Amino acid sequence: MSMNFVTFNQDYSYLAVATSKGFRIFTTDPFAKSYETKEGNIAIIEMLFSTSLVALILSPRRLQITNTKRQSTICELTFPTTVLAVKLNRKRLVIVLEDQIYLYDIQTMKLLYTIETSPNPNALCALSPSSDNCYLAYPLPQKAPPSTFQPPAHAPPGTTHVTPTSGEVLIFDTLKLEAINVIEAHRSPLACITLNSDGTLIATASDKGTIIRVFSVPDGRKLYQFRRGSIPSRIYSMSFNTTSTLLCVSSSTETIHLFKLSLQSQSPDATPSSSLTAADRRSSQSSLGQLSDADDRVGDMGSSELASRKHNGTLMGMIRRTSQNVGSTFAAKVGGYLPKGVSEMWEPARDFAWIKLPKSNPGPGANGNNGPLRSVVAMSANTPQVMVVTSDGNFYVFNIDLSKGGEGTLTKQYS
């Protein structure tokens, strides 16, 4: 049996695991199995909060909505190409294909809208759990340039979009069924995006993985900018806590970073601007794009991260926290004298706390992948804890000191 897919529900109270032989659902606090079926090769599973409604991908193009309590199938849908991701909240069901996104009313399963996208093989997409701020975020589609070649009449229609070359995010209102903003988040193409539980914040990371940015939604103001490290890394998972005061980030390194969303770490340009016109917004986004270029370059050549991260929670941790405080204070003072584009190079804040994943042998639910250890992260709604699920079939719980930060402590482990 191999593990195909793993995800938390919208409030992190449940964990769902899709395998080559059925699926399992666990409560996270306490960690315990609440449902299991051993039928079917399940590619993707998504839950609707703590309800018995579960969305399953049983074959590449077939979606099944199931009621686990009644053990009945509510509906089935077949799509023209492979389903790469499924997102849902109490108002909307979102199906992500490589070059299309389908929006459904989850109450009636009526198709509301179809979005044409650029090729999106990694299914980059985020749906807000909120029923009020019901926003969808995905990479801005990039139109294909006009071709001088005239294909024969019998040829299938050519592609209308090309793979994005920059990291722009489109914000779509799934209630009004209209695009409402474009955020120029990164110079490089996007690797990961996530929305908070209220649908008021979005975190973004590019394929370089050195800089993490947080913007307000829907207006797209940049609020925070964090440095994960100076060495490029693939970002696998990002998650806000339920109060949106912390952001947890996992990557192809075995260090998980926690960033504090506080006034001290806000960007200098994070002041409200309620009277922005469309032209003003385009202008501000253009200038942000130029700053993003500088920030991403700095991300590649900035101060080197301690490769070994051999923190023992005492001397090294104290030195690290002290240097962070000095750095942020110095940047704040210098930022007042430097031009904005230059001051932002000083700005990215380091992590507030971090977690080192333990070395472990693949468990019985592992997928057998010999590549980098992939992980999905979430933060408990009730306690200062980080939950981590890894591709080798392990579930970890770490305690975090919210007052001092530093290295998290492993308290529970399940395989």
Swiss-Prot record:
The keyword Plastid does not apply. WD repeats lie at residues 1-36, 69-114, 139-182, 185-225, 230-269, 310-356, 368-408. Residues 266-277 have a biased composition (Polar residues). Keywords: Autophagy, Endosome, Membrane, Protein transport, Repeat, Transport, Vacuole, WD repeat. The keyword Transport applies. GO terms for cellular component: endosome membrane; phagophore assembly site membrane; vacuolar membrane. It is found in: Preautophagosomal structure membrane; Vacuole membrane; Endosome membrane. GO terms for biological process: autophagy; protein transport. InterPro entries: PROPPIN, WD40/YVTN_repeat-like_dom_sf, WD40_repeat_dom_sf, WD40_rpt. SUPFAM superfamilies: WD40 repeat-like. PANTHER family: WD-REPEAT PROTEIN INTERACTING WITH PHOSPHOINOSIDES WIPI -RELATED (PTHR11227). Component of the PI(3,5)P2 regulatory complex. Belongs to the WD repeat PROPPIN family. The N-terminus might form a beta-propeller domain involved in specific binding to phosphatidylinositol 3,5-bisphosphate (PIP2), leading to the association of the protein to the membrane. The L/FRRG motif is essential for the cytoplasm to vacuole transport (Cvt) pathway, for the recruitment of atg8 and atg16 to the PAS in nutrient-rich medium, and for its recruitment to and dissociation from the PAS under starvation conditions. This is Autophagy-related protein 18. It comes from Aspergillus niger (strain ATCC MYA-4892 / CBS 513.88 / FGSC A1513). The lineage of its organism: Eukaryota, Fungi, Dikarya, Ascomycota, Pezizomycotina.
